[in-house]
Design a protein with these regions (language model features):
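Inter-Walker segment of RecA-like/P-loop motor cores
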Residues: 79-113
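SF2 helicase catalytic motif II
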Residues: 117-156, 160-162
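Walker A/P-loop
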Residues: 24-46
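Conserved Walker A/P-loop ATP-binding site and its immediately adjacent core
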Residues: 40-42, 55-78, 299-302
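Conserved helicase motor "Helicase C" RecA-like lobe of SF1/SF2 P-loop NTPases
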Residues: 299-323
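Conserved pre-motif I regulatory segment
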Residues: 1-32
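Conserved RecA-like P-loop NTPase helicase motor core
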Residues: 318-423
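Interdomain helical connector at the RecA1-RecA2 junction of SF1/SF2 helicase-like NTPases
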Residues: 166-291
């Protein structure tokens, strides 16, 4: 059991929760704290206090995905000295698996009966991590309502207390702004801006990556598209299927482009120039934080694979890549977390929430859905501070899309003016002995380590033709905004539409599909039904959650 020194906010939250539970006689306490502020430790200490006072006998933790469940087991054991058993829906009756259990939200429906038995027969605390997963229209949200109805207490944790879809969740309603509606006395809130000012989170800078696309039609005519300009289609092209859908700035921004050989990813494409900015910024950060890494969030497995190939083409190093078809994905995440020399990790939705990789500093953000909930979750992967000596900053590279810019502006407004200013470091840190050296030093003054030569990368302003650093958002000489021009064929534009298949998925659909993909695949293959196997090949795995929700809705309707 680890002896802990609590952060002031954690001590305040614990004191407030104890009063809410024990003096005022309430059941549900909400902790709304910025990603990386320390919610897991806070809730574990709350649980230990209640155990020590004899108020509870057992603890059940529900977390968003398996990797987060694993982290919960470790942190809970470190704080309480009690073992927490990780259980899945395949385990059946888990009521005698141990005093303290941890499962994913997706497992609740299969485990609702044993969880209900535990809550009815033992004084049980339920800790709900990332509470937005508990939408009552989702199967596990409905299961949670019944399974945990008799829990003595529940602690609800969230770093993003917003649901853009307005769905009601277990225990809490949402107000007209999509925010959790719960009494102030039963809530502890620590905003991202407050967490930055207190040193719990890093300040963040957003790079809006603009681009102008020209979609070339078969007759040679071009249609201009940008984030500020929708593609205008002449009537004579109305018979081209899917053309209007293809002329979407975000779809074009995500479209893979290749060199003339048709196989090599093109570094001069929109995706390539986004990565170029991230690569250059990560190289700068590694001068002062030699272990820093970058994360790419892609909208689909196909694009994640393309981004990985682009990174390898541009850096000479194959990045780590994880998605629901990756063998031993959790082991790969753990390997990246512990391998300080590996610079980049590419994922679809497996790193979007709860996964703690403290060395991440750069996020290249190309999500499938563009909700504020998903935005703040992914942002949370790069803002976790390492403590008082962590002077680094977090960066997000994203397409210049209005909805993403609105999310970014709200985050920036939470930060103090001082936190928004980007400091200029005059030193670099030796990766061997960690000594600080002048930025221009060729070798470490302490251990003699030779710093590798780093070529400064520039781009030319199209207006004044002067050179600027590759990461500059505007010309340092004439002030012109940088927005590269990209040509893309109609075939490639339509191909992107085929990749995403025009399906209306949100980030939670994608995340839930990631969680259930393995079980779904095993079920289909075990059925021996060739037709179902063919459907599984044709339907994107990101859509599994949508399909199961449809089936559940049909079942309910037939029972009415």
């Amino acid at each position: 059991m680890t002896e802990l020194t609590l952060r002031p906010w954690q001590a305040q939250a614990i004191q407030k929760a104890e009063r809410w539970f024990l003096e005022l006689g309430n059941k549900h306490f909400l902790v709304n704290a910025a990603p990386g502020a320390g919610k897991t430790i806070c809730a574990s200490v709350m649980a230990k206090r209640l155990i020590d006072k004899g108020e509870i006998e057992r603890v059940i933790v529900i977390a968003p995905r398996r990797e987060v469940v694993r982290q919960w087991g470790k942190d809970f054991s470190d704080v309480t000295g009690r073992h927490m058993t990780k259980v899945t829906g395949a385990d059946g009756d888990v009521s005698d698996f141990g005093d303290d259990l941890c499962a994913t939200w997706a497992a609740i429906q299969a485990l609702s009966e044993p969880f209900q038995y535990i809550c009815q027969n033992f004084r049980t605390l339920v800790i709900c991590d990332e509470h937005h997963h508990a939408a009552i229209e989702a199967a596990w949200g409905e299961g949670a309502g019944g399974a945990f109805a008799n829990a003595v207490f529940s602690i609800i944790l969230t770093g993003t207390p917003i649901r853009s879809d307005g769905k009601e969740t277990v225990w809490f309603a949402y107000d007209s702004d999509g925010k959790i509606d719960h009494p102030e006395e039963g809530t502890f809130t620590l905003s991202y801006g407050e967490a930055v000012d207190r040193g719990y989170c890093r300040p963040i800078t957003f790079h809006r990556h603009e681009g102008h696309f020209t979609v070339t039609l078969p007759d040679g005519e071009g249609i201009a598209v940008s984030s500020q300009q929708k593609g205008q289609i002449d009537q004579r092209y109305n018979d081209i299927p899917g053309l209007q859908r293809a002329l979407d700035f975000y779809k074009l921004a995500c479209a893979p482009q290749y060199k003339p050989d048709g196989a090599t990813p093109d570094p001069a494409s929109f995706l390539g120039t986004m990565l170029d900015w991230g690569i250059s910024k990560l190289d700068d950060i590694r001068d002062t934080t030699p272990t820093a890494g970058g994360l790419v969030i892609a909208p689909s497995i196909q694009i994640a694979e393309h981004m990985a190939e682009l990174l390898e083409e541009m850096t000479g190093e194959r990045p780590a890549i994880v998605h629901n078809q990756t063998p031993n994905a959790e082991s790969r995440i753990a390997s990246f977390r512990n391998n300080d020399t590996k610079k980049w990790l590419v994922s679809v939705a497996m790193i979007s929430e709860g996964v703690d990789i403290p060395r991440l500093r750069i996020l290249v953000y190309l999500p499938y859905a563009k909700t504020e909930l998903a935005f703040r979750q992914c942002m949370g992967r790069v803002v976790r501070s390492l403590g008082a000596d962590d002077f680094s900053r977090a960066y997000v590279v994203m397409p210049s899309l209005e909805v993403l810019e609105e999310h970014a502006r709200r985050v920036e407004e939470e930060m103090s003016p001082q936190a928004r200013e980007e400091p200029q470091h005059t030193f670099k840190v030796c990766p061997i002995c960690e000594a600080q050296n002048p930025r221009g030093a060729r070798e470490c003054s302490e251990c003699g380590h030779e710093f590798p030569e780093k070529a400064t990368r520039y781009k030319t302003c199209p207006d004044c033709e002067m050179l600027n650093p590759i990461t500059a958002a505007e010309c340092q000489h004439c002030g012109a905004k940088f927005a590269a021009d990209f040509e893309i064929t109609l075939r490639d534009a339509l191909r992107m539409g085929a990749i995403v298949r025009g399906m209306d998925l949100d980030e939670e659909d994608v995340a839930d599909s990631e969680e259930m993909a393995e079980d779904f695949r095993e079920f289909i293959l075990a059925s021996g039904d060739d037709f179902l196997v063919k459907i599984m090949r044709d339907v994107p795995l990101e859509a599994i959650s949508k399909i199961t929700k449809f089936a559940e809705a049909r079942r309910r309707k037939s029972e009415e």
